[in-house]
């Protein structure tokens, strides 16, 4: 999803772009509040993303090295500048009483991001995964457990009590086009949809709602998306993605044909800036055609 957001920012005025990001992966660690999904979007939009696909380019890891020397079990690797970013978020929360949305807006202003990166809620929601090893928070499952084991359960703890921020609802209601990015439907998008009011806002929105399939050439390029879809008894294909989103969608963009709803069949790999911009333009063109 972050790559496509960057492509969108390259073909439209970034100030017109709002990205609603999952906070179910958030974690409190090293005395800081780490918010991986919103930060990933921000770093992509600022052209600061490292070639590994996470963290800041040319970041150093002196703090992690220092913690190891002190006997700390460092299982979540965070660069020095990345940690500074997260510590500043925590400071703004505790000292200035800023919520996640306002704090991230302040951080993004400092790195020149003009798009609106919006945490899905001001309230805490955490994704937990169950395998044969028991229940784990998302980051522990992904990193410490290396996403090993068959997924037996998925919970978005706190979602029922959470509410979408005013900024999220306003972005949905005022959008000309709504795109669900090619992220893991179960792990990255479902936590957003689990916040009461967001699914309903998407259904009621006047703009067309499209999804870009994360399945490319019959495979998932990144992460354990296939394992999550298997847990939900979904086919790992664009049809499976369409089945998961159901009534939310007016159309889907994929590199394979989808029979159940209007589809744009095109290449969806985003290996470079040109490919990201091309896909963004195609998605927007498809949305415009659907809106007629």
Task: Annotate each language-model stretch with its function.
Residues 212-224:
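Short connector loops at secondary-structure junctions
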Residues 3-16:
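A short, Lys/Arg-enriched amphipathic alpha-helix followed by its capping loop at the start of a domain
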Residues 175-176:
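An anion/phosphate-binding loop that grips the pyrophosphate of nucleotide cofactors and donors
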Residues 221-292:
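C-terminal functional extensions of proteins
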Residues 13-15, 205-209:
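A short helix->loop->beta-strand "cap" motif at the edges of active sites that frequently abuts
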Residues 191-200:
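Charged helix-capping and loop-helix junction motifs
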Residues 22-156:
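Electropositive, gly/pro-rich neighborhoods at or near active sites that engage anionic ligands
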Residues 152-172:
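Active-site glycine-rich loop that binds ribose-phosphate moieties when present
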